[in-house]
Amino acid sequence: MKILVTSDDTGAVKEVVCSRGTDTSKQDAKQPKSIKNICSEPGASVRTRVLHMVNFKSTFLVASRLGGSVTIYDLNHEEYELVHTYQLAISNEDKPISLIELEEFDVVVVAFESGKVFVINLNNGKFDLDPIEIQLPGKKGISAFINNPHEAGVFACGGKENDARIIRLFEGEITKDVFEAENKQEFFQPDVIFTARNVKNDHLDLRPPIWISSILFFEEKPKDGYKFLTSTRYGQVRIYDTTHGKRPIQDYKVCEKPIVTLNFADSEEEVIVSDTHNLVAKYSLAQIDSKAFKTHSASAGEITKPVSKLLGKFSAGGNTGAIVGVNIFDDEIISTGGLDRYLRTYDISSREILAKVYLGVQISDVLMLDSEDEEEEEPESEMGDKRKKNIEKRRRKALEAEENESDEEELWNQLEENNKTKIEKKKRRI
């Protein structure tokens, strides 16, 4: 397996090559084949650390850094050579919250807390087109920004006291001509097509606070509408159907701590969440207990709420801090990293831990490039000796099996002979 992990303490990235069964916390377990620092430019530090990474067409590693730079590296170069840097015009306090690849348009999109969005056309590796800056409608900041992978040009965002909104950023294709046009800004006219409404007041008639942390679009959507999922910094997961009003159609409390990441598991009926404590868990969106949560209020009496079924936790390997970097690879493997400085990979279906590697740095993001284990090469002479030993071992086992069979036959024959002798003696007595 080959996994890239951000190194928050140094501003670089670590490449980890390991196989299933690797565990650096055990001396007698497999150890990583290699761990090396990459993407370390002069002046890289915690102030310019990498927060997000994407694998762009298996050709480039695109990284968004604190400070507003977007760096492009050659994935096919052994040392991940830096090929270009975009410096985006943002304030010193602004922070990137999302990095999205739109491969069909040769574009990446970077969103910032301030609501600024930059669209960057890589132009087939020429990097000669200037990024286009877009300001999202509204004055409140955002903490979540995601594209709809099933409909080009449609995005969703939300933040603290800024409920989820669906925005159409553009229509049609983002071609090279758009970036070269004098009126290119006119192509990107953000249009809010849906704004969510807060849930009803609680049993004490208090308004629930709003803080969106992540958003996901469902592939299946209603006619003339959208279906999407949000998580909050108050431990809730909510499902929206825009054809059924502005409030969520389902609202589940899944944990007590703020949810940091939200991902679909191997199907859209299951989600994986991580929080600011040490939770990484899989929940069902289809298996719901409508009265699982019960509490009693002096004014309202007994209160029941629906709860999404917990399918299991990714707890093998002992998470001891917030998990802030989560990557799903081919709907089969989940890689995690966070404050406890460990990289862990799990099988999504069984939740079995596949590898655990201590890196000594805090982690903001992880990105798996390859899930295959590299076989260790052996000299031909050693391989020949091993084959001979295996053949000899199999031959001995076969001989032992034959000897055991002959011994068993002899034993049965002896028993039969003894039985015959006993029967004859009885007949004589009679």
From Swiss-Prot:
Highest classification ranks of the organism: Eukaryota, Fungi, Dikarya, Ascomycota, Saccharomycotina
Biased amino acid composition, Basic residues: 386-397
Gene designation: NSA1
Stated family: Belongs to the NSA1 family.
Subcellular location: Nucleus, Nucleolus
GO CC terms of this entry: nucleolus; preribosome, large subunit precursor
Subunit composition and interactions: Component of the pre-66S ribosomal particle.
Protein name: Ribosome biogenesis protein NSA1
Function: Involved in the biogenesis of the 60S ribosomal subunit.
Coiled-coil annotated residue ranges, if any: none
Acidic residues bias spans: 372-382, 401-411
Keyword terms: Nucleus, Ribosome biogenesis, rRNA processing
Primary location class: nucleus
Biological processes annotated in GO: ribosomal large subunit biogenesis; rRNA processing
InterPro entries in UniProt: WD40/YVTN_repeat-like_dom_sf, WD40_repeat_dom_sf, WDR74/Nsa1
Ranges where the record places region Disordered: 372-430
